[in-house]
Amino acid sequence: MEFTSALFGASLVQSKHKTTKKHNLVDSCCCSKPTEKPTNSCTCSKCACDSCKC
């Protein structure tokens, strides 16, 4: 019984981690083609390039 609850707890922690990771990806931005203009929904401060894509 303890083993099952431990497994369940681990899966809960894992799913929480995934959501956080996804959220971080939304907050940060990735470099895109230089021809593209940065979108308003995206913060480019974390990027080293002129344009970014969320």
Swiss-Prot record:
One Pfam entry name: Metallothio_11
Keywords: Copper, Metal-binding, Metal-thiolate cluster
Organism name: Yarrowia lipolytica (strain CLIB 122 / E 150)
Similarity field: Belongs to the metallothionein superfamily. Type 11 family.
An example molecular function term from Gene Ontology annotations: copper ion binding
Name of protein: Metallothionein-2
Source lineage: Eukaryota, Fungi, Dikarya, Ascomycota, Saccharomycotina
